[in-house]
Amino acid sequence: RIAPGRGFNFSDGKQPLAMARKSLTEMADLLNLQSAAETHLAQYEDFIRSMKPRFVKRGARPLLLTTLIDPRHMLVFGPNSLFQEILDEYGIPNAWQGETNFWGSTAVSIDRLAAYKDVDVLCFDHDNSKDMDALMATPLWQAMPFVRAGRFQRVPAVWFYGATLSAMHFVRVLDNAIGG
């Protein structure tokens, strides 16, 4: 035995940000850092609230959040992902309403994305330019409705399985891509 341990839940499979805030508070109580946690959570809430006006004029076009796995597959993020509470707060519909795993994502073949016509698509980069270039050179990709309409953007990486700091980074990335 080295030291006592304590686990904290990352997600309940439904609302990871709500669970992260709860776990942060529990950890702060255990470490007697309640004030620091309260300060951080207040800053988080203020930041999220302050950014909301940036998305008011965006309209109701659904947003598909993705990241490339390989030239034939993407990971898509659905309703129980880290990003959903932010999308809900800002009134941005999540285009992916299909199946997801516990983490709110699922791997899909590229051809499944052809069904998404009137959507904005953001793809989180993660040092995969070679694979992305290979995908973007294919006729299948070039025929995607959102590609032809100029509504596909590569954006900086966001830690999909993070907590409040990742959510704040996501909001900054989202603002740079589709905010107003």
Q: Where are each of the predicted segments found?
A:
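Structured C-terminal subdomain patch of bacterial secreted/periplasmic proteins
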Residues: 15, 19-22, 116-180
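Short, structured coil segments at secondary-structure junctions
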Residues: 2-3, 90, 147-148
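Short helices/loops that flank or line small-molecule/ion binding pockets
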Residues: 107-118
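Structural recognition of the beta-strand scaffold that forms the well-ordered cores
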Residues: 6-8, 63-66, 95, 121-124, ...
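Extracytoplasmic substrate-binding proteins
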Residues: 1-69, 160, 164-180
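Alpha-helical, coiled-coil/dimerization segments enriched in small aliphatic residues
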Residues: 75-106, 159
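Short, conserved, surface-exposed binding loops centered on an aromatic residue
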Residues: 53-58, 76, 86, 113-115
